[in-house]
């Protein structure tokens, strides 16, 4: 490499010497996923050849109920009868958050839904329309994320403009509702707020 110091202008050849791998706190790392599947194999005796199926099934289930530790999962893993999804989810928390795990498999979940023509279960309840229903899951941000696992054949199709817009709108509505529920006070002590919470204005206002 011709560049000798950090202040020396690098050539394109110099830059290509860097083998960068994208990573972010919002998506589980491959090492964390490997640690999770190792825990599953040791704890639940899941064969190595079905561990990927267990990951995909669990992430797909979270797309229906929300990627949160508070979400209620039902049923056994489609990968192995007798092992519940709830048990597998509990083991994830040792290594990363549920959201981080799901974000890693967002592209796989997206392809599963498109291939089976089955959108997330709560899309209508969350306010999505027919044309954007496949975006109706809370880790949709992981689709096309550089740190998320990409299927070998790529995506069946990328998200449409309508789907991207619908998801961003749903996120803003969720944030607004949360802020309205909590109020705008920075300090929540009763001595400061007198037990009151400042009102939050509407997300959309109309001219009089």
UniProtKB/Swiss-Prot annotation:
Gene Ontology terms, MF aspect: structural molecule activity
PROSITE patterns: POTEX_CARLAVIRUS_COAT (PS00418)
Protein's cellular compartments: Virion
Pfam families in UniProt: Flexi_CP
GO cellular component: a single term: helical viral capsid
Function of the molecule: Required for genome encapsidation. Forms ribonucleoprotein complexes along with TGB1 helicase and viral RNA.
Family: Belongs to the potexvirus capsid protein family.
Name assigned to this protein: Coat protein
Species: White clover mosaic virus (strain O)
């Amino acid at each position: 490499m011709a560049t000798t110091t950090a202040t020396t202008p690098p050539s394109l050849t110099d830059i290509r010497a860097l083998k960068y791998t994208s990573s972010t706190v919002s998506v589980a790392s491959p090492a964390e996923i490997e640690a999770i599947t190792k825990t599953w194999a040791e704890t639940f005796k899941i064969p190595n050849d079905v561990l990927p199926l267990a990951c995909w099934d669990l992430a797909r289930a979270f797309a229906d109920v929300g990627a949160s530790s508070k979400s209620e999962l039902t049923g056994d893993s489609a990968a192995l009868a007798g092992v519940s999804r709830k048990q597998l989810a509990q083991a994830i928390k040792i290594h990363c958050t549920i959201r981080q795990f799901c974000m890693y498999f967002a592209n796989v979940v997206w392809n599963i839904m498109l291939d089976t023509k089955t959108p997330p279960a709560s899309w209508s309840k969350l306010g999505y329309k027919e044309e954007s229903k496949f975006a109706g899951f809370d880790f949709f941000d992981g689709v096309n994320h550089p740190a998320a696992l990409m299927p070998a054949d790529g995506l069946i199709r990328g998200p449409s403009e309508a789907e991207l817009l619908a998801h961003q709108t749903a996120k803003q509505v969720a944030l607004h509702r949360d802020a309205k529920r909590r109020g705008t006070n920075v300090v929540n002590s009763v001595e400061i707020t007198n037990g009151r919470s400042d009102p939050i204005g509407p997300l959309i206002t109309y001219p009089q």
